[in-house]
Amino acid sequence: MNLRLLLAAFALLLSCPASAETTDVAALAKQSGTPDIPGLKIVWLSPWGDVAKAHHWQNIIVHQTEGPAGSARGGAAEQHRNPTRRGVMVWVETDGTVYWAVADDLVPTHTDGADRNDNKYIDNGKTYHQVNKDTSVGVEFAGNYPDVTRPATDPQIAAWKVLVKILMARYDIPLDHVYAHNWIDFKDARYCEGCTLATLAREWGK
């Protein structure tokens, strides 16, 4: 009997860190202002407002921009000055720095209308003309210039692992609503934009 109790206590102990981590992420994600998020270096160009007043975000779209290392800062600054211009809410530099450029009650212009309908990567019956700027948080990863096939850097991947959890928790977005831009639009044939990062996010969440 004592052995059973000991094993049960040990199992409970093992489960506590994961449970605590989930609780911490959920609590952090619903805050306002400029919270410190472990594992992320965030430059808050636009602080978080009341999440209850945020736009009704249903999806996350991963973009990669043909800009050199260091271009996320400039792109985010331009986005902050003109929130609805073509671009995204969140930018990620090659060193892993995250720039929160736009308040989450505003809608930047991104995607090409979710016009992919060939089911090449996923079932586009669920995305066609639905996973677009009006429903989706955009996250832009800088640095694939001059070689568009260059993958995201290790610091970007590490930041993404934390960031995607925060975005999902803040806006109550399910894991299967994390998409690569190439999955929902016809994009550059030289590479699959956002595909590795979106796939990683879905694998991490299993």
Residue positions per predicted region:
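N-terminal catalytic cores of peptidoglycan-degrading enzymes
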Residues: A20-Q130
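Bacterial N-terminal signal peptides
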Residues: L7-S15
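Basic/polar, cationic surfaces and motifs that engage anionic cell-wall
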Residues: A20-P38, A54, Q130-G138, A142-K206
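Bacterial N-terminal signal peptides that target proteins for export
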Residues: M1-L6
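Residue-level marker of positions within ordered structural domains that often coincide
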Residues: L7-A8, A20, G67, D95, ...
